[in-house]
Amino acid sequence: MSKIIGIDLGTTNSAVAVLEGTEPKIIANPEGNRTTPSVVSFKNGEIIVGDAAKRQAVTNPDTVISIKSKMGTSEKVSANGKEYTPQEISAMILQYLKGYAEEYLGEKVTKAVITVPAYFNDAQRQATKDAGKIAGLEVERIVNEPTAAALAYGLDKTDKEEKILVFDLGGGTFDVSILELGDGVFDVLATAGDNKLGGDDFDQKIIDYMVEEFKKENGIDLSTDKMALQRLKDAAEKAKKDLSGVTSTQISLPFITAGEAGPLHLEMTLTRAKFDDLTRDLVERTKTPVRQALSDAGLSLSDIDEVILVGGSTRIPAVVEAVKAETGKEPNKSVNPDEVVAMGAAIQGGVISGDVKDVVLLDVTPLSLGIETMGGVFTKLIERNTTIPTSKSQVFSTAADNQPAVDIHVLQGERPMAADNKTLGRFQLTDIPAAPRGVPQIEVTFDIDKNGIVSVKAKDLGTQKEQTIVIQSNSGLTDEEIERMMKDAEANAEADAKRKAEVELRNEVDQAIFATEKTIKETEGKGFDTERDAAQSALDELKKAQESGNLDDMKAKLEALNEKAQALAVKLYEQAAAAQQAQAGAEGAQATDNSGDDVVDGEFTEK
């Protein structure tokens, strides 16, 4: 069975891991980094992902960042003269991760476990699964990020019973999950969160502050300048990271814009105290989900044994202090906040493939599910924090006499009125026999699978007619769209592979030309003109092919040159070996001739 890789598809950074034996291992990207920026850029028809894309974000307007924040929406991004869905951009990141995982493993990868924030709704989960499919991956399981982190933390502690609180503050989302660990069972008791809170918001506070200060000083609003704004974003992210280790950092952006008198520069000092002041409201927002999760789990702070920090934003000192103050505990530092989620996903891949034994993962649905009933009321069928997979049915009836059809409006959320919750989808059950209101029996059944993806069935118990839908939100892609995007992704992968092969061939040609010219020069006047002339002729042919740019011709001429150059090199080595042998023979003969020169006669007297 092929390996199932674990992928943490993050807002700011992503990571991929694989199980080696029973240990999860993070796979480094081609640049040697263990996490990859979730950035995609387009240049001259080429798709660039990761570190290289992030480096050119300032100068390349066709760069897409933080696409995860748009997952599950119908919003598209414009780049490269086209419009892309969030699923397509995410698929490009997944394809890149998949590609370097395949290089590391030396085999094709077709299956993955992908993580999502615990508080992702159905549309966002479905979009993630679609992105995987477009990237050529069979998504074996969608796992909540805090749950994956708990798996990685607790894999070697399966004999120990404890309750842990996972505090996961990433680039764009925030989750808190409470789990009970014991006997290899990872049981999620409750989860809470905020899908609109993360490191990007902390960056934005610094950006707003820089824009405001610069405007006060120079009267120019940098927020209207796209390139300046990207430079501000880079500087804000760097300053935020610096302030995790030092109490003050210098922000220096020369030539940020131009005024009437000429170029203007942005120079300022940002202290940790000022940063804490700017982001106080964001840190405050992390407290409510912690309290909510504890309340839903029916636990008090004293019941929690360990607090695990996940996500790069948990390195912010004010966040760490807030966690300490809120939980009364020193956070556990045994896991790497940037890598632990991907490692947990790889472990779940091992559970699915059977490589990891005696581990059971019981996750929950983060939000309540139900339908709209008379008066616009939201009637819940499945309460939040219900263990999944699960199924729940309830019987409803018609609201009017002789009603021929019922509209089923499926919702997700916690508010009492339907209008205040998230619509997952609508469908209709038709051909209900004429009857007074309240007589027909319509059974509505909700199913949530292990990935947290919802399907709903409505059945007329009188006629046994039923209608089933797997929820397709307004951002959902049809099978045809996914198929088309998969083909596009495959074509891009082929084009990338072709481009890579072309670069490698050109490099080989350059190297061969250089090496052969050197050998021809070194063999001048050494007596094997036939081989030198043949190599020179093949070299001239390759140079012509190089100028023409015909790859097939270059390949053929390169092979011919290698053959002739090899023959020349053999002659050179044969000559060198013969000379060496002759020298060794001469030295041996000289030693023999001189062997009697230093002989002294001695006298021997017998006593």
From Swiss-Prot:
Residues 595-607 have a biased composition (Acidic residues). Residues 579-607 are annotated as: Disordered. InterPro entries: ATPase_NBD, Chaperone_DnaK, Heat_shock_70_CS, HSP70_C_sf, HSP70_peptide-bd_sf, Hsp_70_fam. It holds the Pfam family HSP70. One of its GO terms (molecular function) is ATP-dependent protein folding chaperone. The modification Phosphothreonine is found at residue 173. PROSITE patterns: HSP70_1 (PS00297), HSP70_2 (PS00329), HSP70_3 (PS01036). CDD domains: ASKHA_NBD_HSP70_DnaK-like (cd10234). Residues 579-591 have a biased composition (Low complexity). Induction: By stress conditions e.g. heat shock. Keywords: ATP-binding, Chaperone, Nucleotide-binding, Phosphoprotein, Stress response. Acts as a chaperone. HAMAP family: DnaK. PANTHER family: HEAT SHOCK PROTEIN 70KDA (PTHR19375). Belongs to the heat shock protein 70 family. This is Chaperone protein DnaK. It comes from Streptococcus thermophilus (strain ATCC BAA-491 / LMD-9). The lineage of its organism: Bacteria, Bacillati, Bacillota, Bacilli, Lactobacillales.
